[in-house]
Amino acid sequence: MPRAYEIPFDSDRKLMTTVHKVNDNQYMVYTKGGVDELLARCSKYQINGEVRENLEEYKKKIDEFNDQMAENALRVLAMAYKQIDHMPSKEEMETIEKDLIYIGMVGMIDPPREEAKVAVAKCKSAGIKTVMITGDHKVTAVAIAKELGILEDGEDAITGSQLEAMSQEELVQRVENIRVYARVSPEHKVRIVKAWQAHGEIVAMTGDGVNDAPALKTADIGCAMGIVGTDVAKEAADVILTDDNFATVVSAVEEGRRIYDNIIKAIQFLLSSNVGEVIVLFFAILLTPFLATKFGIPIGLIEPLLPIHILWINLVTDSLPALALAFDPANKDVMKRKPVKASSGIFTKGMTWRIIYQGIMIGLLSLAAFVIGISTPNPPVIEGLTQEQVRVEIGQTMTFIVLAFSELIHVFNIRNNKESIFKTGIGGNKQLFWAIGASAMLMLVILAIPVLRAIFSIPVLPMDRIVETIELVIAPVVIVEIFKLLKINTSKDE
């Protein structure tokens, strides 16, 4: 039968109707949609080709069938029809979905994707609360939510009508325990998003239809479907999922956490290194009278680092590894941590503690290198320099080497603040490996080529001072490993 007219599906009505022409004097009206919504527009029902009255008496049986299907996670679609003798006018179209004859229902299985179950489980372990908002029957929604692991014992599922009866204040109070919303309207979605935001939560909302646009716009992160999503939904969203897969959202969260962690690593590395440099210079100035008296060196010569040393460390030693940390893979526990609160700053208690103690550690080790260097008893003879000047250059060289190489090795400490470097290893980031290798190689070039040694005022070190320098370079790894072992490298909230 040719289709003469169509009333498209509407999320408020939850119905769709088509009018078909049989002949000039006979038209058929077919309606399909939600069981409750359709039954409200039916006055009769049909069994085995026989149309019967008293639909009210039969509704109980229909509801039982509906619940049975819904409990099996089937999406139930009810159908009805009626016959009319003329093509309805536009005015009549508004009332055409009345006095229908109910003919039955069909249950359609729409199994959740396997990756969706895994994604929901990942969200749960990551401290992300997953909420289902659907137009399905409540029983169907509950069955699917339980299968996915969204709804657990003690958590609530409510309908749009129940939500309608709540004030926004009441919804805000209850929202943290509600995991499923069934038979909701577009306005309800906006209310749900705002209720979560009232608790200070960052809310991501997925949607594909025109009616999802307000909620997508209201959410902190609106995610529209790229395949089935409407243009209106895509315009309102911040992110478009090209594969329409919820698991992609979870993967994006994981990648976001990796990027955030790597930014933190780079900041911690740079600041702890800079604190180390400041400590060396500050205490050297503070101790200048003592060091001059103790080792018989003129006060004007007490200088642990030359300007060229500081420039080299800041521009070469620090910058390359800091940039390469951006490519670090995610830590194993990245999706087992609670989300960072929006109000939390980058400088948490744990990070501040690590920057301070690791900076002091690097600084004091470098200062120790300077003191050991200027205490050299029989320094080599260098033409044009006094013994005191040679001892100072040895101290400066040892400080320069310890500061530069200890910072390079310290990068591996920073990659994981909880697990031992011997457990995490030094692999997994080729860019970091090459960055550290390049920085180390450039340092060795300076130490090996006489012309560059002269520019950087670097003498050849006695063998005992070389051994002591290597020991001081390795020391940061040992100290941080002890801190990790004693669980004092992190704060309680990490």
Regions found by a protein language model. Give the residues of each.
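Short active-site oxyanion
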Residues: 25-29, 128-131, 178-180
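Membrane-embedded transport module
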Residues: 152-205, 224-418
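Cytosolic catalytic regions of ATP/NTP-dependent phosphoryl-transfer enzymes
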Residues: 1-102, 108, 121, 134-146, ...
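C-terminal transmembrane module of polytopic membrane proteins
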Residues: 326, 401-494
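Short, acidic loop-to-helix structural element flanking the phosphoryl-transfer center
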Residues: 109-128
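Residue-level signature of catalytic and energy-coupling elements of molecular machines
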Residues: 18, 34, 69, 79, ...
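Active-site-proximal glycine-rich helix-loop-beta segment
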Residues: 212, 218-221, 237-238
